[in-house]
Amino acid sequence: MRTLLLRSILLALPMVVRRAAKKHKTVRDKLQSGHCVVQLRMRDGSLCRHYVFKNGTVTGVPGAHSRPDAEMVFASVETALAMVNPNPDYAVIIDALKNFKASATGADRCTVWFGQLMHLVGTAGWEYGARQKDGSVRYTNLTNGGPLHVYVRDGRIIRTTPIEFDATDAPSWTIRARGRSFSPRRTATVSPHALALKSMVYSPKRLLYPMKRVDFDPEGARNTGQRGVSGYVRITWEEALTIVAGEILRMKREHGPGAIAIAQPAHHQWGNINYWLSALYRFGNLIGHTKVAFSPISWEGWYWGAMHHYGNNMRLGVPGFYGTTEDCLKEADLIVFWSSDPESTGGIYAGYEGTQRRLWAKELGIEFVHIDPSLNHTAQLLGGKWLPIRPGTDSALAMAVMHEWIVNDLYDRDYVAEKTTGFGEWRDYLLGLSDGIPKTPEWQEAETGVPAKDARSLARIWGSRKTYLAAGGLGAGFGGACRSATGAQWARCMVLMMAMQGWGKPGINFGNLQLGVPMDLNFYFPGYAEGGISGDITNTGSAPHNYVRMPHVLTMNAVKQTIPRQRLPEAIIDGHCSGYAWDGFSLEGQFSRFEYPAPGHSRVHMLYRYGSSSLGTIPESGRFIEAYRHPSLEFVVNQSIWMENEAQFADIILPACTSLERWDISEWANCAGFLHHGQNQVNHRTVIMQHKCIEPLGESKSDYQIFLDILTRLGLGALFSEGGCTELDWCKRIFDSSDLPKLVSWKDFLKKGYQMVAPGSRASQAPVDMRWFAQGRSKDVPEPIPLPAQYSDEFGKGLPTQSGKFEFVAQSLRRFEAEDPERPALNRYLASWEGRGNPDQAVRFPLQLITAHPRYSFHTYADGKESSVSDIRDHRILVGGFRYWVVRINEGDAAKRGIRQHDLVKVHNSRGAVICAADVTATVLPGVVGAYESSAEFDLIETPEGLVDRGGCLNLLTPGRTMSKTADGIAPNSCLVEVGKWARAPVQAA
């Protein structure tokens, strides 16, 4: 009976394809593009049929073909039926592939084409989007800045708006605090860079066709020294893919394992399929590559410092924030925003979701203190007391406050005695008993510039009230003072302060109301860091859930060579580098030294650059220019959407499309991985079907399709796509692997484009983070970390430290401090190695440059490209026909230099020079200049004083030095510069 069913299916296949082609243009076009013979047969020869595809038609022929272009062989009828089922069970299919119950031979391009055709026959009739009265169609999509409705008419985007929830969506949560009830507005809030996406899609800087550098010849002179100078000529996709695939094979044959390096940005376009932790890792693992590894560049001080006192290494040393929104609104008297400006950073991916909650706190009479070198946007919105502080000296103020707590008995003695170790040694240091220097408010004033009376007042108010500490953009972590030479000291001081006050007790916790809303976190949907379709269980968070719940083929990188991305220039230029890389699974892993080249591996000779730009995000980025032009780097390919600063150093450019031009699926703000439950930032938990709103512009393609095209030329396309799965097929597989089918059908989800997850009952919502520790209970928050082996007591009992308690003197650092005196077990105050306290440096460069995370763009995303973000005067200023990056300078410092509002100025030091437009303001501390990091523009011009960048790439000036000998963190905020009026007329690029 089952054999008869299989015969019937194979017999009917041509008719089904022809009917689908007649009805759907996408199937018709796909059918027209294929010219091949595909054969399906049983391994024992009992059944065989082949299909001839030619000139847009298909014919089925019984029996075997002598030379089929592609052949699929099945071990049994059951396997064959599973493989041809229009509603496949991928657990059965993947089992068949892994255990060779089914196999494919022949031309990879034919196998992939046939698989995609069969998938398209099944999906072409799926409906999505909502037709509007004005004739447009409304689609949904998700960005790094929040979810959008995208309106399209005649194949062109006409507008984008934040998603507004309606009565059919789940109810909002309600918090009751101090006699009032609070519920969030029923609309999504999004960041400026999200609303700029339409302008970015149609940017004149879009890369629409494959390009080759004019003086690059893969068969002859490569002229590596001309990268960044020479222009480009348009080539066909066939030419581009042939060159790239050929270079991959040449690298392997001529140089061996490790010759190909793949580099990606910290972030990319949103989505579980096209994100770099997904499709890129799958691609890279299949070809084998030297991993240019990311590091916690927004969390440096927490990872290299704070976690040694209490653990949480799998969160980069940052706490979890569960339940803190309600606890703060109910219990807290004071919020101290220390280097925390959530109104600029939007948390991470969450738009302005936290703004309303912070305004509730203001309505309730909760007081605010802001400690920052500038009167930042959060301080301006909320009001409160501003304590301007010299950059890099924050630890001195923190120590003085803790000194006052001790001498005035303003700390939680019982908590410290029962739940911590090492306090006696720490107390003696603060009181000066061990080094003869009491850390008094007067002592810190000389370092920080904060008046002793203000430090004393802060200590008194904080120590006598229930206080939330907001240390960084998320409330702990994400930018701020942790990104400096003293960043680890500062982050360590932050957790030490909380331990002294009774961390986890009602009203005493980390947070700035950016995270910790009431939410049902038992509902599962994967975040992007869970690896998407990568199949990589060692370098992503795939193993616990994603790999188990969504059957797919495992991939693994056979090359064991790694280079941290900030060390890539040294690796290429010098041929070697060493240091300490990020390890998200083990606290002690950060003490393991890496060496490049790794034994038995080749040096890097090819760089595959994927998206965005390092020049705007990595300190002392001028090093990358020299690396790109080094003769040992024989080939550079850049897969990018726009002609940004790093794309111009490529030999071959592959044009990728935006997230509005391809399919994907994801959840708002759910990155998972080391920001587990990051969706706890948003007011309404929402999963988004990222509709393909328009066709890709020009000849651009999705990242997934580009990888598939390259791998198909290498005979790996069928493996990469698991038999020809399209992005839409993968979306359906991810949907099925989640808890979404319990709430909504695939048909309805695809049509509407989003599904809100109800906040659930109180029992389904997480308890307050660290409350369990304060009350002496086992851990009860819903995070699968730390690992069982990291406990020194019973599983879930105590902290993952050597003692099981909070350690004022970190035992993990004590075991290693002889190797690195700048990272001692006792968190002693050490001045910055580059700062205004160093007179030799400060004479030439008396101003300290702070480059914060940008308010309007997302790193380089949305900057430049003539996007609407560039029209914002706080982001770029139009002077003489060119939009210049903005640098903020104190009124007094500007007057001394003859600088007026919006004058062009040269910001410079020994590392380089950048032309910016001045914003003269009283909101920046004297001696400090402030700007955003992450300019996407890099535009060197010739001047009598040498080369100067007018694009705004201030990371040319920041130091490439690591935080300390064994802490490979970056320290861009430890940067001295001088600022002078740029007297020359606006100039054109050289």
Q: Residues of each region from the PLM?
A:
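Long, contiguous, secondary-structure-rich segments that constitute the structural scaffold
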Residues: 182-189, 687-760, 839, 844, ...
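Flexible glycine/proline-rich, aromatic-decorated loop/lid segments
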Residues: 374-377, 645, 650-688
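N-terminal export/assembly segments and adjacent metallocofactor-ligating motifs
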Residues: 126-410, 451, 494, 534-550, ...
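Flexible, glycine/charged-enriched surface loops at secondary-structure junctions
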Residues: 255-259, 412-416, 469, 505-512, ...
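Feature captures hydrophobic
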Residues: 1-130
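Short acidic, glycine/serine/threonine-rich loops at helix termini
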Residues: 161-163, 272-277, 346-350, 379-384, ...
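N-terminal leader/propeptide and maturation segments of large enzyme subunits in energy/redox metabolism
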Residues: 195-202, 206-239, 271, 408-456, ...
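Extended redox/cofactor-interaction regions of prokaryotic respiratory oxidoreductases
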Residues: 276-360, 364-366, 370-371, 396, ...
